[in-house]
UniProtKB/Swiss-Prot annotation:
Tissue expression: Detected in adult brain and liver, and at lower levels in intestine, with a clear increase from the distal colon to the duodenum. Detected at low levels in heart, lung, kidney, pituitary and testis.
Source species, domain of life: Eukaryota
Name of the protein described by the UniProt record: Transcription factor 7-like 2
Record family assignment: Belongs to the TCF/LEF family.
A GO MF term: RNA polymerase II cis-regulatory region sequence-specific DNA binding
Covalent link Glycyl lysine isopeptide (Lys-Gly) (interchain with G-Cter in SUMO), residues: K297
Modified residues (Phosphothreonine): T178, T189
Region (Mediates interaction with MAD2L2), start-end ranges: 178-372
Cellular compartments annotated: Nucleus, PML body; Nucleus
Length: 459
């Protein structure tokens, strides 16, 4: 290898020095032109989006569409090369067609119009829905072009890289639920639009043009292995296996298709598992009366019916008892004597109180001899026989039972003004049960023992 002499070193310079050629300067000029063209394109596209959002006049829209974006030949060449590389990766890479027909596709059409008036593909085709699964970047351009597109839009989160596939957040002017996510068994041809949609017509030439280039499919099929592994951010929208999913479109969302094709906003067509859960509690935590389960309602209704039935039964018993006449027990010998001699005692004495009259009759009864009392005992025996013939099934316990029931029916809060008679410790006689007549202490103790009277009787 020939060696250079020391004299020529000053002319050539150091060995590690970089020598610039004319081609490198031309490349820098091309890069500057490309960056300026991309900035102009982003400005034009943002103005188009703003005009479409504010629904301005058709004249302003047509002027914005007729405005030609400055583009260079080198940028078009780069976009074509990137499209060819993406098509090759899609044919031989991860996202191949399904191995068997009928496997559901996930189809994500463009959020806005992906084509400019001159028929070229706009950078919005590279934006994706805000989801957490990896999608194939169709236009895998250089890192510089993606960075300029990101800077032209509103600030968005950093790229989420999963298996070296970038996922970019969509711009702020598009609603996250705008794209149409459907599962279908039909295959869509890459170059032909759906039959129910009108063809896109060029405003300048009037010739219909296809919405997508023929070499790129507008829908991205997912392989069977990746569908089950992708976590869906909208959990209640993910269908279960074997169940169809309906389009998610409402009138309030932006959609690139005519409004006549939008689906009604009501969720009546959704399966039950897709409807989001609703809160059934008030702010206080008490369930709404219309949301009470049928079992609770049945139990409450059964308890109400049982209580009504028991109350009706008790009312019927009370009515029957009222209808039955009160049967008095047969008079004994002393009662027969009192019945006969009461008028004579009242005529002889000036006392008008029954208690004093009863005391006088009692003294006279005990003063009678056995033979005189035997007459009244015989009358009492005949009275009992007659009573047994008239009321064969009668017993004195029937009347006592009624009195007990009356005591039970009384409420514990009820009080009587003669209650002090029961609490008087000086009383040696049994308590008085009949409280309807006043002045019981006077009849019991008499006027001589007023110190034993209760409070109400002493008044």
């Amino acid at each position: 290898m020939p060696q250079l002499n020391g004299g020529g070193g000053d002319d050539l310079g150091a060995n590690d020095e970089l020598i610039s050629f004319k081609d490198e300067g031309e490349q820098e000029e091309k890069n500057s032109e490309n960056s300026s063209a991309e900035r102009d394109l982003a400005d034009v596209k943002s103005s188009l989006v703003n005009e479409s959002e504010t629904n301005q006049d058709s004249s302003s829209d047509s002027e914005a569409e007729r405005r030609p974006p400055p583009r260079s030949e080198s940028f078009r060449d780069k976009s074509r090369e990137s499209l060819e590389e993406a098509a090759k990766r899609q044919d031989g890479g991860l996202f191949k067609g399904p191995p068997y027909p009928g496997y559901p596709f996930i189809m994500i059409p463009d959020l806005t119009s992906p084509y400019l008036p001159n028929g070229s593909l706009s950078p919005t085709a590279r934006t994706y829905l805000q989801m957490k699964w990896p999608l194939l970047d169709v236009q895998a351009g250089s890192l510089q072009s993606r960075q300029t597109l990101k800077d032209a839009r509103s600030p968005s989160p950093a790229h989420i890289v999963s298996n070296k596939v970038p996922v970019v957040q969509h711009p702020h002017h598009v609603h996250p639920l705008t794209p149409l996510i459907t599962y279908s068994n039909e295959h869509f041809t890459p170059g032909n639009p759906p039959p129910h949609l009108p063809a896109d017509v060029d405003p300048k030439t009037g010739i219909p043009r296809p919405p997508h280039p023929p070499d790129i499919s507008p829908y991205y099929p997912l392989s069977p292995g990746t569908v089950g592994q992708i976590p869906h951010p909208l959990g209640w929208l993910v269908p279960q296996q074997g169940q169809p999913v309906y389009p998610i479109t409402t009138g309030g969302f932006r959609h690139p298709y005519p409004t006549a094709l939008t689906v009604n906003a009501s969720m009546s067509r959704f399966p039950p598992h897709m409807v989001p859960p609703h809160h059934t509690l008030h702010t206080t935590g008490i369930p709404h009366p219309a949301i009470v389960t049928p079992t609770v309602k049945q139990e409450s209704s059964q308890s109400d019916v049982g209580s009504l039935h028991s109350s009706k039964h008790q009312d019927s018993k009370k009515e029957e008892e009222k209808k039955k006449p009160h049967i008095k027990k047969p008079l004994n010998a002393f009662m027969l004597y009192m019945k006969e001699m009461r008028a004579k005692v009242v005529a002889e004495c000036t006392l008008k109180e029954s208690a004093a009259i009863n005391q006088i009759l009692g003294r006279r009864w005990h003063a009678l001899s056995r033979e005189e009392q035997a007459k009244y005992y015989e009358l009492a025996r005949k009275e009992r026989q007659l009573h047994m013939q008239l009321y064969p099934g009668w017993s004195a316990r029937d009347n006592y039972g009624k009195k007990k029931k009356r005591k039970r029916d009384k409420q514990p809060g009820e009080t009587n003004e003669h209650s002090e008679c029961f609490l008087n410790p000086c009383l040696s006689l049994p308590p008085i049960t009949d409280l309807s007549a006043p002045k019981k202490c006077r009849a019991r103790f008499g006027l001589d023992q007023q110190n034993n009277w209760c409070g109400p009787c002493s008044l």
